[in-house]
Amino acid sequence: LGDVYKRQKSGIEKAETIAGRTNFIKTHGMTVIDDCYNANPVSMKSSIEVLSHAKGRTIAVLGDMGELGSDEKKLHHEVGEAVGENHIHTLFAAGELAKEYAAGAAEKSSDVDIHYFEDRETMTQELLSYVKEGDTILVKASHFMEFPKVVEALSE
């Protein structure tokens, strides 16, 4: 059994993560959770829960989710509620529907520091001046929002 355990341990240690799929990146004294390949309400809430277990200041950087149909506003609102319920310190939200994240978070907690932006570019510039060493930052949105550019900016 010892050899089997050693091989399994070695395999796990050598495993490489895929960009945009819950990839933990250590950069500039911060931890960035790159989960921006795609998003739906269930994966958003799960990622927010993961973020809530981090030490230090927690920052959810969320963009719109696509292809949700007529319930899109309600579903974005519920994700915002999860931000408040999970005691996330700060929400940076970008996109037309991301207003609902802000509304949902504010509804569930007055302690969330909420920053809403209409576009990713403006949000990214503000985020770069906001983050500091020790922060854990979740970056998540549907692929069309191009949030890998946010991860790149945080990593430079």
Give the positions of each predicted feature:
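ATP-dependent carboxylate-amine ligase
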Residues: D3-E156
